[in-house]
Amino acid sequence: GLSRSWGHQVVVENRPGVPGMMAGKEALPDGYTLTFGTSGTLAVNPAVYSKLTYDTQRDFAMIHGGGVIPMVIVASATSPFQSLKDLVDAARKEPGKYNIGYGGVNNTQHLTGELFKSYAKVDLVGVTYKGSAAAVTDLLGGQVSLLVDSLAATMPHIKSGKIRPLAISTLQRVPQMPDLPTVAETFPGFEGVGWAGLVAPKGTPQAVIDKISEDTRKVLSDPKMRDMIMDRGMVADMRGAREWGEFVNAEVVKWAEAARKANLKAD
């Protein structure tokens, strides 16, 4: 999309995690080298790692959101829980009886689950997995009562009827599942989502940031692009530089507090 807008090729270098963020941090602040930052690299890692070699707020300028990745609280199709209310009522009645799996360790899924426990004031035993596949397998096998994972990871199993969605973690309902209530409808203000977007090295001229932000918005406004994003279990993020920057800063603070409350540390 941006290649067409700019009339020249955009070269993508895959450098996941910390190496990618360091390369982005050390690039010239001229707008020619951008980084696709995520909730993991920009907000969750700073919350759980004490010795990162970059600082989200000090080293990067936010350009534009790309996509929001909803998380879903699900139960197996044979679970007695038909709704989020059923789950909360049962968990409050018998604290510590039920467990909740996370499709990852010290990641957005993990922190979203811990944030939910805090909002709902429930005692659920957290069980971490190395990835979504193992977590879903244990949910279907009855080893865990519940699971927090991305919409993308759970949607095929929801459509097949093997697992039952109880609530979604976005502030508003999502087009992929318009009948699925949000957690926020029961616990106002709750939001626990993954996300990704463009960032530049700090010091990039504001005029350059504004131009790239405007061009990114045009790309995301294309119905075909939005459909492609939706098909991947995400929602297009139309927030520009200022609004997305405010959101990311708030996420850094929110996840740091959630990790502190849950005593989560990766190092």
Residue ranges and their predicted role:
Residues 134-191:
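Anionic-ligand binding region
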Residues 14, 28-31, 67, 83, ...:
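Conserved functional loop/turn residues at catalytic and ligand-binding sites
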Residues 40, 104, 152-153, 169-172, ...:
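Glycine-rich beta-alpha junction loops
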Residues 26-32, 39, 47-134, 182-183, ...:
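Hinge/capping helix and adjacent helix->loop/strand transition within the periplasmic-binding protein
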Residues 20, 44, 83, 112, ...:
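Hydrophobic alpha-helical segments typical of transmembrane helices
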Residues 119-120, 159, 206-267:
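An extracytoplasmic/periplasmic, membrane-proximal ligand-sensing/linker region
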Residues 1-58, 97, 121-150, 157, ...:
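N-terminal (or domain-start) structured segment
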